[in-house]
Amino acid sequence: MAPQRMKNPPHPGLLIKSDLDGLGINITEAAKALDVTRAALSEIINGKRGISAKMAWKLSKAFTNSDPEFWLALQAKYDLSQVGEQCADKVRVLWQPSSLDNEGIEVNSSENKVK
């Protein structure tokens, strides 16, 4: 079984905003430290722009307790939550792996028939 996902994970920009607020750093200072424009950082913080690989790398250098994969994973979870519900009703199963029932008999899960 796949791990459970957050139904509506927050945009990673909210975490950045929270961290900056906690540190008493404004957007202008943070943008300079990250070597990005204030507008670009503001768009991320306000959820209007996603975190790219380059930004993830910069954030991991600025917030040394994180790595780029952390920031990209947050963005991926957010992105998946945004498209998941839109696609769920429009896509049909093409293949599903077989599994064994309680008696060790192989069952095709998509057809619920014993092979």
From Swiss-Prot:
An example molecular function term from Gene Ontology annotations: DNA binding
Alphabetized InterPro entries for the sequence: Cro/C1-type_HTH, Lambda_DNA-bd_dom_sf, Toxin_antidote_HigA
Residues annotated as domain HTH cro/C1-type: 16-70
Pfam families attached to this UniProt entry: HTH_3
Keywords: DNA-binding, Virulence
Annotated DNA-binding residue span(s): 27-46
SMART domains, per the entry: HTH_XRE
Keyword DNA-binding (UniProt): yes
Similarity comment: family membership: Belongs to the VapA/VapI family.
Official protein name in the record: Virulence-associated protein A'
Source organism per UniProt: Dichelobacter nodosus
